[in-house]
């Protein structure tokens, strides 16, 4: 695990509420080269009244405009993240319709020129979406490749951290015993290794590695191996 990732996890481990957590997100976004960030999450623990959290440091005028015009219904990042876990790079240049173009041009007038968005969700149905934005420069393909791992790691870590705060889940309710093989697979996953690479390192088949990772994901109540590694670290299991 890189020192950047370790520092991020350490910071999230000591936050006590959503506001403290978002301060860490803002600081991290700045280090990644973004002026603005936003995180939204909906918890399904109450079917009648699902809890929704919206945190951002966008200009106040844009926040007001966004709410008044109900832009959540036309915001392409929201529409994308409702149906996909894949990251989306956005700007007015990527607009597919005139409505989208108008939306992005207005956002640009408030300093939101280009950005990156990705959703996340877990097994209990908590959905989250992280957006990073800035007022200058396009996101080049080179920058996207260089920063992808960091931005993906931030998305998963934020979701795991804030879901724990909002849902107030006692993790002791779940089966948190991990076998040595499961821990080993998660440690190497945290180092950025693929299942095939882990298989070579520990001397088992790729299928066996995936078996251990799937078991870990179920025990830790997450839906991907990166989230499993993050949660295991945060819970002191590795």
From Swiss-Prot:
SMART domains: HTH_LUXR. Positively regulates the expression of anoI. Required for biofilm formation and motility. Probably part of a quorum-sensing system with AnoI. Pfam families: Autoind_bind, GerE. Gene3D superfamilies: Transcription factor LuxR-like, autoinducer-binding domain (3.30.450.80), Winged helix-like DNA-binding domain superfamily/Winged helix DNA-binding domain (1.10.10.10). Residues 170-236 form the HTH luxR-type domain. Induction: Expression is decreased by virstatin. It comes from Acinetobacter nosocomialis. PROSITE patterns: HTH_LUXR_1 (PS00622), HTH_LUXR_2 (PS50043). This is Transcriptional activator protein AnoR. Keywords: Activator, DNA-binding, Quorum sensing, Transcription, Transcription regulation. Residues 195-214 bind DNA. GO terms for molecular function: DNA binding. Belongs to the autoinducer-regulated transcriptional regulatory protein family. Disruption phenotype: Deletion mutant exhibits deficiency in biofilm formation and motility. InterPro entries: Sig_transdc_resp-reg_C-effctor (IPR016032), TF_LuxR_autoind-bd_dom (IPR005143), TF_LuxR_autoind-bd_dom_sf (IPR036693), Tscrpt_reg_LuxR_C (IPR000792), WH-like_DNA-bd_sf (IPR036388). One of its GO terms (biological process) is regulation of DNA-templated transcription. CDD domains: LuxR_C_like (cd06170).
